[in-house]
Amino acid sequence: MTSGMAQTVCGLLQPQKLGRTLTHEHMVMDYKSCYFKPSREQDLHLCSKKEITMQNLYWLRQNPYSNAFNLSLGDEPLEEIIAEVAEFKKEGGSTIVDNTTYGIMRNVEALKKISMATDVNIICGTGYYLDHTLPPEIKNAPIEELTQKMVNELTVGVEGTNIKCGVIGEVGCSWPLTPIEKKSLQASAAAQAETGAPLIIHPGRDESAPEEIIRILQEAGGDISRTVMSHTDRTIFNRSKLVELAATGCYVEWDLFGMETLFYQANLASDMPSDSQRIQDIKFLLDEGYEDKIVIAHDIHTRHRLKKYGGHGYAHIMVDIVPKMLMRGVTQEQIDKIQIANPRTWLTFK
């Protein structure tokens, strides 16, 4: 029985063994379906480069979705990504939730190899990503079929393996929601109700998106208290909206630590906050009394953010962010809640 347990790619785990947890990352994925043409015609020659160098690294930081090589993580052999995850372990990390779902090339067998090589607990996700990444057979499937596929991956195994998912999501949502994305949300809520699994959402890029998503989940029988709303740092810029979101009972996730860029390529109209601003917003929500509902991560989903290529890697929060949080008045007890207690509560099957 999964009730009262967490479920990793290597099997069931006592929740108290989860330790310091990154709640939203990717280790093995193909994000080429989310390619963006660069805004400058003269930069088109950089899109096909199959290497990351000192000469193109800054350009990639501003245009991460315009280079195919950058949009692939965890290529075989797995030594590159194993070394990156091992850095997280070395700095005191224990568990990573891989949010790669149907549409962006999840590979659960590779995740199990990474877990066994690094002794890091890895929890993989079931569910469906954004509309444009999904094939017609998924878009045309009834809710019941979408639900059953997720239930099977949570209780039986993924694609003929005995590797089971331990979370639903990240469930992809655009703004405005498309019909398949609404159907995916409804199916995710139904799968959560049936299995007791934790749920995590990728909201559309609008401050009203989380509110609409929560309403749909509630109407479909989802448990908001066991749901993470991802990407707060690129979605909500009004602190009153931030409090409204936390008041719904969901977990509020800042998951783009390390991503500091002048232009956020997926939404050029928004101003991506710095890590310092993320910490300030977290401190604000802590002071509002929501320390039990905050989780954090990096959402690494492009190669240039790995240490090998001059990026911050999976240990950035452990090495750089936690000390800065302490300097800004966040207590060690609050940090332990954010990194250990809150993820543990969320990841424990009901």
From Swiss-Prot:
Give yes or no: UniProt keyword Endoplasmic reticulum: no
Positions contributing to a divalent metal cation 2 binding? 170, 202, 231
Give residues annotated as binding a divalent metal cation 1: 24, 26, 170, 299
InterPro entries for this protein: Metal_Hydrolase, Phosphotriesterase
EC number, as in UniProt: 3.1.-.-
| Binding note for cofactor | Binds 2 divalent metal cations per subunit.
Keywords recorded for this protein, A-Z:
Hydrolase, Metal-binding
One Pfam match, given by its short name, reads PTE
Superkingdom of the organism of origin: Eukaryota
Q: Name one GO biological process term.
A: catabolic process
Cofactor section: a divalent metal cation
Q: What class of enzyme is it?
A: hydrolase
Q: Which PANTHER family match?
A: PHOSPHOTRIESTERASE-RELATED, PHOSPHOTRIESTERASE-RELATED PROTEIN
Per the record, the similarity remark reads: Belongs to the metallo-dependent hydrolases superfamily. Phosphotriesterase family.
By what name is this protein known? Answer: Phosphotriesterase-related protein
Q: Which organism is it from?
A: Nematostella vectensis (Starlet sea anemone)
